[in-house]
């Protein structure tokens, strides 16, 4: 492109500028991708997955809890060169504790070192999985401590987001 001052110098295209910026700020050569731009599964050379996500009820791309958690898992795995995969318990919204455990077991059997489980409904299955697979680390999203050293609970005060959203709306 010609520059706006018509000095005859050419300007770099946006793509070239983005590439140069990525090379300068990203020594690993990775672009700063949004989670939605990252593939849904990435295997390691041995075909195993280091990080697994077991969904809560509903679909993976529910534009809510599962999707937000999954996008965070993908982004972390991508940024840290980890392989990853998601598992949905059988029977969808009617999933039982056995269905949830079987999804966690499938993830552990596939080589997952970290399994992220979303939703408080995972607790019973997670207790069984944590005991069955003590070498696997579990992240319990929307859960409370359940007494296992290999389980890291992450809970949040859901009402706070509604309060803050309301406050932000009034302030605008």
What is the meaning of each model-derived region?
Residues 1-5, 9-172:
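A residue-level marker of the well-folded mature domains of exported/periplasmic proteins
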């Amino acid at each position: 492109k010609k520059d706006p001052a018509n000095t005859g110098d050419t300007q770099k295209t946006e793509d070239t500028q983005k590439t140069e910026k990525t090379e300068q700020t990203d020594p690993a050569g990775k672009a700063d991708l949004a989670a939605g731009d990252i593939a849904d599964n990435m295997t390691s050379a041995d075909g195993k997955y280091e990080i697994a996500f077991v969904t809560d009820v509903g679909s993976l791309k529910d534009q809510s809890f599962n999707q937000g958690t999954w996008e965070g898992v993908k982004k972390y795995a991508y940024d840290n060169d980890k392989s990853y995969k998601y598992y949905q318990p059988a029977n969808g919204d009617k999933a039982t504790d056995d269905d949830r455990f079987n999804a966690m077991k499938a993830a552990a059997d596939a080589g997952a070192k970290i399994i992220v489980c979303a939703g408080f409904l995972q607790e019973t299955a997670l207790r069984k999985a944590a005991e069955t697979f003590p070498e696997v680390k579990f992240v319990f999203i929307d859960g409370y401590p359940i007494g296992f050293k290999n389980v890291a609970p992450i809970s949040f005060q859901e009402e706070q987001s509604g309060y803050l959203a309301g406050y932000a709306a009034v302030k605008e």
